[in-house]
């Protein structure tokens, strides 16, 4: 029977499937951070249980950490309690921890792949909604709740219903300067923030295959923003080249065997998807969100939408509410929208490729008056590589702040928050009301678009001189 990539990985991980019951699947990798793990560890202690597979559990500190200091004294009392609790729990249960002093510490969805923890054909879970990032490697990766975190800790399994399958093909080649972030925002703009609900999405097509692993991670990272359970991309030579030699990747003869096995992880030619979406790559322009969800997105050369153009009353009301919150007027050119904050970072866009793209627009320029711009590398290794290439100096000379790794301004959970009324060009993944701080307005863009906005003081079409 012909199978999709998702179905192959799913079937390989079924431990038990009782009649009329959701199957139990095996979990190969469990990624843990300081926010969603304390209650799970406590549950194990109360029940007197051990951690089932400490060697398959990896922890880091990222959500609440400071990006200005590696000292615990820089943390709020709650944040300090969380990171200290994670440290104690990892020591007690034998979990490998990348703490704030470790050179490999970073955002869980950045440091996992770069260490080779993420491998094709595996099932990966984490108490974080953007776990879909790891699907870029042909893994089945999805976020879970705290009670499920405890269940995985205790059993290394999960009870899960099988999802429907969706193919999203990005046909042809994108124009010069169009990034993975533009591709995925264009996809979400087409199918909406709930268009993938109930599905595991496989991204494919020439434009997807041409992406680096960093770009593929950006695309899969935002699968959840279209409502999907997970996003996946079939592994290929690009995948293998990225993984070879990384710390937790197979070595020697095991490597050759793994690469051979990974070559089978692709959708069969005659497999049938439950839904198919096709996007023409040539039609994708630089994208940015205008509203309060990632589906409210337009191209840089388009106008802020007019709610009167919406025939669906629910959509019309949604547009009206979004415009009121973000304080924009229908019909405004997006290039006329000014910003006063810029955030380059997050599990979506904080890898070395992202920082290089942003540095191109920062080099030899200055951050505009009245604009505060911060650059937050996704991990210690990304920071080290960027500094070796001199990217930090480019940003600093242009007036950007160069920070320590962490989730930072993606979410208002640490000290990197926006103030009421701030308008931010952000490379993160969510532009919900208050996501970056109470009363703040977020516009999702690529790293290049964010850096260009920082120096211009407003959004610009990076395809043209500015």
UniProtKB/Swiss-Prot annotation:
Annotated InterPro entries: 3-IsopropMal_deHydase_lsu, Acnase/IPM_dHydase_lsu_aba_1/3, Acoase/IPM_deHydtase_lsu_aba, Aconitase_4Fe-4S_BS, Aconitase_4Fe-4S_dom, IPM_dehydratase_rel_enz, IPMI_cat
Cofactor(s) of this protein: [4Fe-4S] cluster
Function: Catalyzes the isomerization between 2-isopropylmalate and 3-isopropylmalate, via the formation of 2-isopropylmaleate.
Record text on cofactor binding: Binds 1 [4Fe-4S] cluster per subunit.
Assembly and interaction partners: Heterodimer of LeuC and LeuD.
EC number: 4.2.1.33
Family: Belongs to the aconitase/IPM isomerase family. LeuC type 1 subfamily.
Pathway the protein contributes to: Amino-acid biosynthesis; L-leucine biosynthesis; L-leucine from 3-methyl-2-oxobutanoate: step 2/4
Coiled coil residues, start to end: none
Binding positions for [4Fe-4S] cluster per the UniProt entry: 347, 407, 410
Alphabetized Pfam families for the sequence: Aconitase
Catalyzed reactions per annotation: (2R,3S)-3-isopropylmalate = (2S)-2-isopropylmalate
Cross-referenced HAMAP family: LeuC_type1 (MF_01026)
Entry superkingdom: Bacteria
Protein name: 3-isopropylmalate dehydratase large subunit
The organism's taxonomic lineage, starting at the top: Bacteria, Pseudomonadati, Pseudomonadota, Gammaproteobacteria, Alteromonadales
Species this chain originates from: Shewanella halifaxensis (strain HAW-EB4)
Gene Ontology biological-process entries: L-leucine biosynthetic process
GO molecular function: 3-isopropylmalate dehydratase activity; 4 iron, 4 sulfur cluster binding; metal ion binding
Entry keywords, A to Z: 4Fe-4S, Amino-acid biosynthesis, Branched-chain amino acid biosynthesis, Iron, Iron-sulfur, Leucine biosynthesis, Lyase, Metal-binding
Top EC category: lyase
